[in-house]
């Protein structure tokens, strides 16, 4: 998993 600020819908 790639860390991300906004979750994917």
From Swiss-Prot:
Gene Ontology terms: cellular component: extracellular region
GO biological process, one term: defense response to bacterium
Subcellular location: Secreted
Swiss-Prot/TrEMBL keywords: Antibiotic, Antimicrobial, Bacteriocin, Disulfide bond, Secreted
Top-rank lineage group of the source organism: Bacteria
Role description: Has antibacterial activity against the Gram-positive bacteria L.monocytogenes, L.lactis subsp lactis and L.curvatus H28, but not against the Gram-positive bacteria L.curvatus CWBI-B28, L.brevis and L.plantarum or the Gram-negative bacteria E.coli and Pseudomonas sp 55. Has no antifungal activity against S.cerevisiae, Penicillium sp BKS-TAN2 or A.niger.
Name by which UniProt lists this protein: Bioactive peptide 3
